[in-house]
Amino acid sequence: MACARPLISVYSEKGESSGKNVTLPAVFKAPIRPDIVNFVHTNLRKNNRQPYAVSELAGHQTSAESWGTGRAVARIPRVRGGGTHRSGQGAFGNMCRGGRMFAPTKTWRRWHRRVNTTQKRYAICSALACLSLPALVMSKGHRIEEVPELPLVVEDKVEGYKKTKEAVLLLKKLKAWNDIKKVYASQRMRAGKGKMRNRRRIQRRGPCIIYNEDNGIIKAFRKHPGITLLNVSKLNILKLAPGGHVGRFCIWTESAFRKLDDLYGTWRKAASLKSNYNLPMHKMLNTDLSRILKMPRDPRALRAPRKKIHRRVLKKNPLKNLRIMLKLNPYAKTMRRNTILRQAKNHKLRMDKAAAALEAKSEEKGVPGKKPRRKKGKKTVGVKKPKKPVVGKKAAATKKPAADKKPAEKKPTTEEKKPAA
């Protein structure tokens, strides 16, 4: 399978190259922006929604009134009457059985979304650019292993087909019938409530046929499941990128393929069929940075490489870090030492002054002066001080004289206790 080329071969209805070539339109080289495609698809798809809402009377078609406080039950309105299970049950609230929903839906919701025209065109250009990349088309699930070329262009004679068998024969000759067989094999029952809402069956997407004029081509291809037919002048992003995912398999007619340059422009020439529009530009024309940096011609366009390494220095607080402070102010060490000495000197002066005042006061009362007591550290609780060993005369005086030991008397035995016979 060939890749995207500047010249695209045109294939006949027999599946062979007709010998004619078509220049690849510039729109196939447009920037690929899946984010824009997804955004535009999401917003345009919202325009097909049908308004819905619950009834305004739902949950309120009963007579209920709150019992008030003092009954040890919630203050929710309760159904009146008796003789039935319903009486006394809560009503109206969204937490009650049979009550209304929270924030009932209204039909005046903002259902539709407006999308900028330029943004819609950008999305279509990106979706068209993906049609020429086999990897993206295959990742979407299309069976294009045997397709001769992408984009696949056929002669304009196909636009005059009116019979289904002619369309089947063409798809088989172009090796695109495998994609239709995939659709047949994927038909299955929908999971969920959609089965009850006229959406019973689902299936995969098949190829998209893009034509210029309808001379019967719609009747020929419309019977096959999964096939979508689009006019090249009315391309739809919902059909080109189903689900907001780029890469759908498309088959073009020759006249439709040639018309793309007039519809979207070529960068050098604006679009002739649109007013004041040209293709979006790429952010980078060449993404190979190594090639750009090593380009020999015109090196002045590039800034000279920065060879000097600027290392970030961790700034430490000199008020907390003495080493950094000494770098900034070497005299700081001397200042600190002088401050400590001055504080010690002042403390000594205060103590001497207090001692002198106490001595003068004691002399007035006739009591010899005492030195002022200093603060002692807190005593530890539960710790006994070890006793100092007593040495010298005190030790001899404190020792008690040993009592004279008497010889131990022997206790009489049982035989001695017996009286002599």
Swiss-Prot record:
Annotated stretches, region: Disordered: 359-421
Post-translational modification comment from the UniProt entry: Citrullinated by PADI4.
A GO-annotated cellular component: cytosolic large ribosomal subunit
Record InterPro entries: Ribos_uL4_C_dom, Ribosomal_uL4, Ribosomal_uL4_dom_sf, Ribosomal_uL4_euk/arc_CS, Ribosomal_uL4_euk/arch
UniProt modified residues of type Phosphothreonine: T266
Glycyl lysine isopeptide (Lys-Gly) (interchain with G-Cter in SUMO1), cross-linked positions: K361
Protein's cellular compartments: Cytoplasm
Name recorded for this polypeptide: Large ribosomal subunit protein uL4
Origin species: Canis lupus familiaris
Keyword Acetylation: yes
Modified residues (Omega-N-methylarginine): R97
Modified residues (N6-acetyllysine): K14, K106, K259, K333, K353, K361
